[in-house]
Structures are given as structure tokens and as C-alpha cells.
A protein has these predicted regions:
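C-terminal structured domains
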Residues: 161-164
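Acidic donor-binding loop at a coil-to-helix junction in glycosyltransferase catalytic cores
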Residues: 153-158
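Conserved donor-nucleotide/metal-binding helix-loop-beta segment in metal-dependent transferases, i.e.
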Residues: 2-81
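Terminal low-complexity segments of carbohydrate-biosynthetic enzymes
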Residues: 56-59, 63-135, 142-144, 166-345
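Active-site rim elements
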Residues: 147-150
Length: 345
């Protein structure tokens, strides 16, 4: 049992170096990905654990959201190759063991990150509450799921949060193996460790929806989907000042959380002082700390308007898209029902 931010990464100097470390499985990944969908957590644990003693040492808080009957609606796996991120900021969220491996490589952190050759995932089968939509994902479409056609940055995380809202009792099964992810474009320019900062983006919507209202308890998924859509519709109808105020609060919370993580990384530097990449990593952390503190101290009074200006958009366009998204979510069950009638010819 664990959370998405507990995934580990191993970085390689090149795609060739990575391939030399590959262990090719002799089973069909599609069949393996689908085998647990629709099963209960109890059934999955019986199939994957040698006995109750296998749970020894697990943090009980990780199991609190689940019960023996918790269904598996989604399964996913690790990534082998490009991590799929727009920059190298993802390494900031890795556990200390991964950071240590990164800094211990004589190539240097940025050169290693620029190779875009990594394994990212769990070391074995892992149960968690949230999904991130991996390169190969299993979906149990026999039950109502939120729309799952992510095209933009952050929409995979938005799907995971919406799935949790619809089925708070469900569990996500993470396989311990990975599938290749080799983009067609050259992404070697994405190795730079730029200071961590937070601005208004799609993730603000995901963060807002993550906080489920207390009156959702015991409500069926169909009604929960409508409640989700109504939340988004209400956001699209807010006055500009009210919307800016909400986003300001979300940004402050997110920046404070990232600053705390940055300070934890800085505190851990004493254990990394003899590694080749420690100085570079320390500079990155100090710049990130200063950037986050600066954003917290000089809070932008109009984060939404500024984000829209950078994106060459405006508030009315955002409102219209929000309303259209809400209406599309409400229509999603009908779309799924119509899809059942499709036939391949």
C-alpha cells in the first residue's frame, strides 16, 4: 500500500544504457493488466500475498480508505523510458533514495535528467487510492467512470481525482513492471533543473475537486458525477473577484506545501555531502526555496487574469469552457451507453 508520490525512479545515462538493464517479461502485459479489474481488494490480496504476515510493517493509515470489498476499477504500471513530463521538476517529488542515486552519478544531475531514460514506478504490486493514468492503463468500464480521454497537461491527475470522487471506496492496482515510453520528438532540452514555482493552471481545478463535500457520503456514483459537474459549473459562474480569491488560497496552500518539501530536501543534504551532484542539487533547492518564499510573500492579487494573459485567453473563454466541461460530464453516462451499441465492421 502506498501513495503516487512514493513511486521510485532509476535514471540511466542513455537509452542504450537503459536497454542493457532491461529484463523482458515472458507474459502478456494486456492480459496481466486486466486480470484484477472488477475484483475486490480482498480477492487481490489473497492472490498476491503469501499470508497475513506479508502485511507486517505496513503503515495502517494507508489501508484506512479501503475494506475487503473495495473494488479495483483501474490498474496501471510503471514507465520505462521518457517520464512524460514537460521538464525535470518531477525529480523534486522523488524519495531520498532516488535523489541519492541521481546525485551519485558522475554525469551530473541535469545531464542524467536530459537523457530522458528512466524507470519510474513501484518495486512490486502496490495498492493506492489515486490513479495517474500510466502508458498502459486498465479500466473497468462495467462501472461508471469519469471521462478518461486526457489530451492536455495535468488531465491525467484530474481524472484520478474525479475517479476518487465517484468511487471513494475503490482501490487502484499498480503493477510492479513497466512498459516502454519512447516519444518521437527530441526532449533532451528538458533536463534543466529550474527553480520550483507554482502558478494558476489546470491543477488548481484538480486540487479544488479533491476536497469532497461531506454530504456526498452514501450517494451513488451517478449522483456524484452530477455533483462534480455542478461544482465546475458554479466555478464558471463566479464573479471574477470570488474566483481570484479561491485561486489565491489554493496557490498559497500549494506553495506552502512545496516549501515544506523543499526544506525537507535541504535538511537531508548532510547525508549527501560527499556525492558528485550535491552542490548542483543544493543550488537548485536554494533557488526553489527563494522562489517559493518570494511567491508567498508577494502574492499576486490577480493570478487567474495573469495566467489567462500568458495563455492568450480571457475570463469569458474560461467560463465558457468550464460550463461546456460541466455539461459534457453530465452527458458522459449517455455517451457511454451509446458506445455500447457500436460494432466493429
Amino acid at each position: 500500500f502506498d501513495y503516487p508520490d512514493a513511486r521510485e525512479a532509476v535514471l540511466y545515462t542513455s537509452a542504450t544504457d537503459q536497454q542493457n538493464h532491461a529484463v523482458i517479461a515472458d507474459y502478456n502485459p494486456l492480459t496481466t493488466m486486466l486480470k484484477s479489474l472488477g475484483q475486490s481488494l480482498g480477492q487481490v490480496l489473497n492472490a498476491n500475498l503469501s499470508g497475513a504476515s506479508a502485511l507486517k510493517g505496513i503503515d495502517g493509515r494507508l489501508t484506512t480508505p479501503f475494506g475487503a470489498e473495495s473494488p479495483i476499477h483501474l490498474s496501471q504500471c510503471g514507465t520505462w523510458g521518457d517520464p512524460g513530463t514537460v521538464d525535470s521538476g518531477w525529480i523534486f517529488f522523488q524519495p531520498e533514495a532516488c535523489i541519492k542515486r541521481l546525485l551519485n552519478n558522475p554525469s551530473g544531475p541535469e545531464k542524467l535528467l536530459a537523457a530522458r531514460a528512466s524507470w519510474l514506478g513501484y518495486r512490486g504490486t502496490t495498492i493506492g487510492p489515486y490513479s495517474t493514468l500510466s502508458q498502459l492503463t486498465g479500466l473497468d468500464h462495467r462501472t461508471l467512470l469519469p471521462p478518461y480521454l486526457p489530451a492536455g497537461r495535468g488531465e491525467d491527475l484530474l481524472f484520478g481525482i474525479m475517479l476518487r470522487r465517484l468511487h471513494p471506496e475503490s482501490a487502484v492496482l499498480n503493477e510492479g513492471w513497466a512498459v516502454p515510453h519512447y516519444p518521437v520528438d527530441n526532449r533532451s532540452s528538458r533536463g534543466t533543473l529550474s527553480p520550483v514555482n507554482v502558478n494558476a493552471s489546470m491543477m488548481m481545478l484538480a486540487d479544488w475537486l479533491e476536497c469532497a463535500p461531506r454530504d456526498e457520503a452514501g450517494i451513488p456514483p451517478e449522483a456524484r458525477l452530477i455533483m462534480l459537474a455542478d461544482e465546475i459549473a458554479r466555478l464558471s459562474q463566479m464573479t471574477e473577484d470570488s474566483l481570484e480569491g479561491i485561486v489565491q488560497q489554493e496557490l498559497l496552500s500549494k506553495r506552502a506545501g512545496l516549501l515544506a518539501r523543499c526544506m525537507d530536501h535541504l535538511d537531508a543534504l548532510s547525508e549527501l555531502d560527499i556525492l558528485p551532484g550535491t552542490t548542483h542539487w543544493q543550488t537548485f533547492l536554494q533557488q526553489s526555496r527563494d522562489s517559493l518564499v518570494g511567491q508567498i510573500q508577494s502574492q499576486d492579487p490577480h493570478p487567474v487574469a495573469d495566467a489567462l494573459t500568458r495563455g492568450a485567453s480571457d475570463l469569458e473563454t474560461l467560463r465558457r469552457r468550464g460550463f461546456d466541461f460541466a455539461e459534457a460530464i453530465k452527458a458522459w453516462p449517455e455517451i457511454c451507453q451509446a458506445a455500447r451499441t457500436f460494432e466493429l465492421k
